[in-house]
Amino acid sequence: MMIEIGLIGKKIGMTREFYKSGQSVPVTVIKFDKGRVIHLLSKEKNGYNAVQIGFGKIKNSKLSKQMKGYFAKKNTEPKKILKEFRVKNLENFKEGNEIGIEIFKDTKFVDIRSKTIGKGFAGAMKRHNFAGLRASHGVSISHRAHGSTGQNQDPGKVFKNKKMAGHMGDKNRTMQNIEIIKSDPDNNLLYLKGSIPGSKNTQVEVKESVKNIRKLTMAEKIEKIEKLKKIPEKKKK
């Protein structure tokens, strides 16, 4: 059964782990705080079923008067982030319940969502991988320009989403089917294969993979290869 809710943690850096075969794999480490169910939204009252979960700690002094009252009414400590997850039914959830990385106990692949590193204002060559203009032969002080931006008097405008220089990075991005290499429930750490967008301390949302494809993990692939190696070859006639 698919896990409908997710967790929000922060990226604390990269390291590497080793498979039983000795092969190393780069991993990104995500640190989670225990999430708490703050509020339940029902189809009868709100038009859809959802679970509101709070993540992270925040000082009471940084909250607005309305949010102070909200958390006091729910009889829970203030949370930095409130996130809604739509669910089919609310039977398994109750206000005040804590949720940790144990929800990914039987999960092999996850989808993550985080914000990319901001690069500031960038030209077309860096931002869109344009080739640029020629180094000589008629080109003067336009070597890194993006070239033509439109047509003629008709349509007489630059179309929206034209690739030009502008602000690069600092965008929300989703990566799918990221393999879980290891989980550490005692320290609330999740080790994900490869790199993910964002710098250290970037907020990362992790959910079970929606595509739910039948894909082998790298450890399973290595194990399969090792088994095939042990099968003796047929003697040549």
Pin down the residues of each PLM region:
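Extended basic (Lys/Arg/His-rich) segments that typically form rRNA-contacting surfaces
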Residues: 1-237
